[in-house]
């Protein structure tokens, strides 16, 4: 038994949203009680007690779109790299990195990403992986890191024809084999999806192969209209818009997650809504790659299930929230834009996305939900109550303030110390692997 208490509790449970001095009791991987600290301690007097010391207790974060393979690009300088547009960024940086990744480097990239996620209070990660230098077994390598560190993750491999049809088919099979493996796993900690890069690097032949081989019970995870070229190529080569093409290939549906969706029109948004397809917004990436601002507020208003990701830019979901908030205010010239929509995406949207792949209810502190809890070192200088929670979180909190992270009932970090690995050794191994990758890229 584990009890975390003596903190301001944000539950994300509409029936009981805020407790001034709250506690949460966990038995194994399940929350068994949420209430006032003294009452919870009376019911479970012998439980291990973690003192939040007046900080914020809340559900752990979920990242709905991540790129583990990008970990070693931090600080990387590639000879001759001078991008003039999004395609140059893809080919000159990201595809260059993924073509050189070894299996061991992929695994260490996963350790780096998951450790940083833990330190930012993220316990569930939807990753979209690519390592065309070594495809087969890459998802199992990432899974090993996830299991070792105790995080929950949904994985896929980025199918693409960009490096030839042989590697494209190998990437299809990497997805198929991992999905079957994940479906047979009863831990509720591992899931798989059919990963796809984007429409403009996937032929009809490959689309057909994916349709033929995709196991039942899962959907696709694909970038959609992230750059304008993706749309232009689809119109020119296929005579239709991207979402229409995906619909024609039976890609859309309640288990499918579309990343970005910058260049989509009203008809496409209606199609996404009608098929109950999920969308994930990645604000920092869209801005950093100069791709544009998606009509995310319109999607949320239409009732499309929309979540929030980071696309590898950060592992701090609070940072992604802050950026999304100002991006849409700036883009729409509306000071009211994004105030309610973005936290809805982060908390409600990401939780619903995760619950389409994991059985235990995530993203909420209530009886029967998953024991995924974080403690944040935040002492508000103004009154805090259920009516102003989001204002406190957005303006007062960042990921580095997370003190304790619990996933599936296991304490992964306490008082900023990662307990599930030798962090210093892992980081040293990562630095060496990153140097070897950079040396290999630059020859």
Where in the sequence are the language-model features?
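His/Asp/Glu-enriched, well-ordered alpha-helical/loop segment
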Residues: 248-251, 255, 297-380, 394-398
